[in-house]
Structure formats: structure tokens, C-alpha cells
């Protein structure tokens, strides 16, 4: 016969329901959680036997909730395995919620009696409604917590996605990602290890300064070869390590040593995989070993997947900007190369002073020695520098020029040595300096006498050590550059006046070249005048083929304080104002000290005689045929006692200059 509900919940003999309710009602009514529910049973009123531990096992969730008589409570996934004298196990039917099991445990004293078990069984039945209500609340709380967790996970993924989509610059990207990860997880360290083919190092470590308000991201060289990184990149699987478990690895791996020095106890390395490419890894560390739960690791893997895409995009953008800069530099270098292709044979002269100078140029060009070109303004120092470069083994590498007087002192250091991003206000990108651009080639430092004193030690260091440091950077960059300096100032006098460092002067003055002013080589003026006339006439589409004798006399009688540059400007103005085929030289230019008259200098008369006749196409063709014939007779040999220059009665450089002007190639002639 089935037991009625009244009989089922009736108290055992000797127990009044009022006594039990009076003691349990207040505790059971609280129902603030598992501990409150179990706490209602300890201590039990007489005639219940005392217990030291109560354990509730909910089969649906498979959790064990324990409450001790000392007031402590524990949630576990396995039942109590500690010392016990006896226990009493009782099933609790929860309807649609399944079953639970209540254990009353005695850890010391005597064993339970049958009456104890009867009392415990009755208690298990009367708490069924309370337990059912509590489980319903618990399920709702669990569902709510899951929804909140999903919401938080979705939020952090959205924030990370927004961060990676809003930046193409790698520095800003990593800084924003580090800030979002730190904000959500509270990690002590967020870093990235990325491969960088632009640097000598295989990998660079990007460490975020999480203590700063702007969460700055600071790239640095890898401290050494990391076994942990190699393993992660090879397997393409996350690697989690704890210092307490892997002490041997933490004492030897450079990445882990760096983290340990900052107080970190656990580290997670997640590969950044984008397609078939793994450019690096996300390095996370914390002072606790419990933060990297399985759930957090899965979320961090999703974050790493988004970061990998962003890093790929940032790298592609950086490659595009580098390519753009490279193309601009290449365009500049090609323009410079067109000018630097002018060798000694293209320098117009016939004076002995220039012949002696160019012999020195020919000697020094074959070495890597530093050259200091001195001379007045307008004497052609840059032309000589280009000739040295063109005759050197570096001719196929760039010739880079910088005018030290034309750039403000505040910008000159950046132009020479470059700067890293953030080195100063407005430095939004990394900038390569002229030394880096000229690597492998030649750097021409024009107007070196105007180099500020504060930059001279840095230039001296580059000349000595062959390495530079960008402005705002800490990494040394080796450079292989041949330096040619030029000045129109008296550097030695500047050294004595303490306006120029003596040690830098000696470094630059390895092979000095002194360019003669135009007034000291007047025999070159007719040739230069003819060259500039032809050049300007072609440029202005004028048919000017003669220079009057009187015009040449007057040109050769001036002292030319502006030297060749001034002569070129005078000829340009004359060509501009000429309306016929004979150069109309306007003499409204100030005349200063006159040079010796033509009658007193046979060299000047000889120079004049070569230019008194008009330069006609017929004369050019005759000269061309004569040079071609002699080249064929000498088998293309230009210099030497059997060369064409000797047979034609002219210097080698003069012959080469005329061959270029007339379009004669030895290869085509033979």
C-alpha cells in the first residue's frame, strides 16, 4: 500500500515537526546558495547525531557541494575522499530536474545508528521542495552567466576587430590590440614576436608598456634564439607554459627569462597564422598561473586569428609604402645617375691646372678614400665629385647628394641619419637618412663647412665606425658609404677659430683636391663659352653657331668671382637676348680686376684661335670622319703612344669629349 504524503513527511518518533521547523525554517528560507542551504543542517538539533560534513551531489551538473562544521565550503567535481568514520547516503528526487544525493559524513567519533539514518532520510525528503527551487534558480543563474560571458566575448572580439581595422601602421596596431587584451583579461604582459625581413634580425619583439596611459608599443631586437617560439611556429599550435612546471625552460629561453624578470609566472604563445603564412606569434604572460583557462585560451585564439589578418594587412601596406619610397629614391638615383655618368672626358678644359687636377681625380677614384674638394663657389666641385664616383668601383651604386647649408640645422640630423617613428613631433613614419640611401655607393656632402658643431661628432663616428643610429632609435645600422665632402670655406681657419672640429677635419682631409678658380685658367674660358652657347641654344631652340672675337676677348678679360657658374649665367642671358646666329654678348655686367691682355699670353691667343671660326655642321662632320678613320687605324685604342689621341695631336680627355659630342662609339666604329 502506497504511503501518503502526510505519512512521508511525518517526523520520526520522538521528534516534533515544530522543533525541527523552528530551527531550520529561518536557515532554509535564506536559500542564498549552496553553502546557505547546507549550512542549515549544521549543527543539527537533538536527537540528531552530530555530523562534521554534509555533501550534496547534483547528478545533472555532476558537481559536489560540501559544507564543513568549521564553516568552510567547497565545490568539487569528485566526491569527498578524506578521512571518515561513517556516512549516510540518501537520494533526493527532483522531478524533471533529475536526482541529487545527500551525504551526512562523520569524520570522528562513533558510527551512525539506524535511528540516525532514519532521521537523515526524513530530512532529505523534507528539503526536496527547497532544493528544487534552489536548482531552478541556479539553472537560471548559470544561463544568465553564460549569456553575459557570450556577450563579453562578443564585445572583446568586436573591440579587437575595430582596433585591427582602424590601423595600418604596425606600431599603432599592436599598441591598440595590447590595450584591448589587457583591459579585458588584465594580463601583466602583452607582446608580439614578428619576423622582419627589413632588418638583420630574424625576429623583432614588440613589447607594450601597459603601465603607460597611451600603452606605447616599443619594438626591440629579440634577446636570442627562443626554443618556445620555434616550437610554436613549427607546430602552428598554441604553447602554454608555467614557470613552476617548466623551470628548466624558464631559466634558459630568452623570451621566458625576459618575462620572469618582470615577475610573470605563466606564458601563452599563440601563432599568428594567415593562410599558409605564420609571420610571428602573440605572446601573453601573467603573474598568476590560473588565468589561462581552457575557455580563455580558446577566446585568445579567436583574437589571435583576427590579429594575424591585421598584421598581414599592415605588412602589405608597409611593403607598398616601402616600394613607393624605393621607387621615388630610384627615380632620384636615376636622375642623379644621368648626371653622374659625366666622367673626366666630359669635363671641358685645356689648361694645365685642370689636367693636373684630373690626374689626381683619376688616382683617388679607384680607392674608397674620403675626398675633400675645396674651391671657390661655382668652380665645379659637384662635377668633380660626380667624376670621382663615375670612375670608382661604386659607379653602379647610388650617388647621393646633400647640401649641408641648404637644410635647417633642426632637420639636418634627420636627413643625414634618418629617424624612427615617434622620434619627434610629426615623425609619423620611419625615415631613412642619406647614409642609408647611399649604402654601397657614394655620399656627397656639399658645403661641409656649414655642418653644425653639434652634428660633427656624429658624422665623425660614422666615418670611424661605419655605422649610424637613427634619430630616436637605439639600434646601430652598418653602412658602406664612400664620403666625398666639398666646401668653399677655409676649414683649417675654422678649426683654429673653433668653428670646426679638428678631428673631423683630419678625417675628411684624407685626399684633398683644390679646384683652381676660373681666373687662374683663362685658357678654358673659350671652350666653356662655346659649350654653354651650344647647350643653351639647343635648350632654347636657337640657331647660334658663332661667338664674336670681341665677345671672347671680353669674357677672357674678366676675373669671374662666380667662376664657371657665373660664366654659364652670362652665356644663358646672352643666348636669350640673341636674335641672329652670332652670340650677342651684353656687357652690362660689372667688370672687376682685368686679367692679362691677350697679347701678353700666347695660351690665350691659342685658345681664341680655336673659337674664332663658326661651329658649323659641315665642320663637325669633317672632324667626325677624321676621328672615325684614326680610331679604325688604331683598332679603337684611344690613349697611349699608339692611340688615336696621340695621332690626332690632342689629349685623351679632349678626344673622349669630342667623341661624345659627335656621337662616336668605339664599338660601332670597329
UniProtKB/Swiss-Prot annotation:
Question: What keywords appear on the UniProt entry?
Answer: Activator, ATP-binding, DNA-binding, Nucleotide-binding, Transcription, Transcription regulation, Two-component regulatory system
In this chain, ATP is annotated as bound at: 375-382, 438-447
Any one GO biological process:
DNA-templated transcription initiation
Q: Which residues form the Sigma-54 factor interaction domain?
A: 347-576
Occurrences of domain GAF (ranges): 169-311
Under the heading PROSITE patterns, the entry gives: SIGMA54_INTERACT_1, SIGMA54_INTERACT_2, SIGMA54_INTERACT_3, SIGMA54_INTERACT_4
For this chain the motif Cys-rich segment, might bind a metal cluster maps to 207-221
- Please give the InterPro entries that the UniProt record associates with this protein: AAA+_ATPase (IPR003593), GAF (IPR003018), GAF-like_dom_sf (IPR029016), Homeodomain-like_sf (IPR009057), P-loop_NTPase (IPR027417), Sigma_54_int (IPR002078), Sigma_54_int_dom_ATP-bd_1 (IPR025662), Sigma_54_int_dom_ATP-bd_2 (IPR025943)
Q: What induces it?
A: Induced during anaerobic growth in the presence of formate; part of a hyfR-focB transcript, it is not clear where the hyfR promoter is located, nor if the upstream operon (hyfABCDEFGHIJ) includes these last 2 genes.
Q: Name one GO molecular function term.
A: ATP hydrolysis activity
Q: Which residue numbers delimit the DNA-binding region?
A: 641-660
GO CC annotations on file: protein-DNA complex
Effect of gene disruption? No effect on expression of the hyf operon.
Q: What is known of its domains?
A: A Cys-rich motif in the N-terminus (residues 207-221) may bind a metal cofactor or iron-sulfur cluster and be responsible for sensing redox or other signals.
Q: What is the role of the protein in this entry?
A: A transcriptional activator of its own operon; when overexpressed operon expression is strongly enhanced by low pH (under pH 6.0), strongly inhibited by O(2) but only weakly stimulated by fumarate. Expression in situ is very weak.
> What is the official name of this protein in its record?
DNA-binding transcriptional activator HyfR
Organism whose genome encodes this protein: Escherichia coli (strain K12)
What gene is it encoded by?
hyfR
